[in-house]
Amino acid sequence: MPKSPPGIRLLRSLLRAGKQQRSMLSGIINGPMLQPKRKRARKAVQQPSKAKTEITASAIQARANARAGPTTVPGKWIASTYCARPLPASLPARRLAYWLYLPNHMPTATARRGSPMIVMLHGCHQSATQFAEGTRMNQLAEAKGYAVLYPQQSVTAQSQRCWQWYAESTQHGDGETALLAGLIESVCLQYAIDRQRIYACGISAGAGMAAVLALNHPEMIAAVGLHSGPVFGAARSQIEAVHVMRHGAGAPPEHAIRSLLLRRAA
């Protein structure tokens, strides 16, 4: 049976992640934010049995393996942190954790020009390593010889790890847009990346953030892939963002996109 084209395999990977993301989003919308927690009855303290201790140790090891990321692909799996330069008279510099996959094998033409790079933006309640595992993007990257960058939203910045695509400063190119653009530039300076072939891809809140990043930096992002994401300009606050997640966007995005392009041209 002939292999599916790379675009079809990418879509299938995102569909798998999309199923997981829908269950997570239902927890955000219908979960603790809208329903009070029930009080639990107190239970007597019991000493853990040997079997329970072994299960707990196994669970801890499993979580450690998840943080370590995919281990079945021969390329390099690099975990690091990007620290943005603070502007004068601004808040302390913000830090952004990220993971980077570099393929073990590259075609000769790719090696001469540098690796193409896909920036993968996870959804709410996800981590970068979970997104990498769920989409299997590293396996595809190894087969084709391109790098994959996985930024990870901080729980300090957003308690549910949602990218703040809805923030007005972010939509205008500041905030998390500037942070991600700075991270991409930093990675390009450290590794042999083909700057003409940098792509952004995301799911849910990550899709919204990928669209904002591409619209504000068309000179940096060659193309975008969006899955289950809000349209640009659909919300300007967290409350509006939750409404969009539940009911969709009412107004078409053309006006917001046109306004952004006019600001860039000015």
State the predicted function of each range.
Residues 134-138, 166-167, 217-219, 242-243:
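Glycine-rich, phosphate-binding/catalytic loops in enzymes
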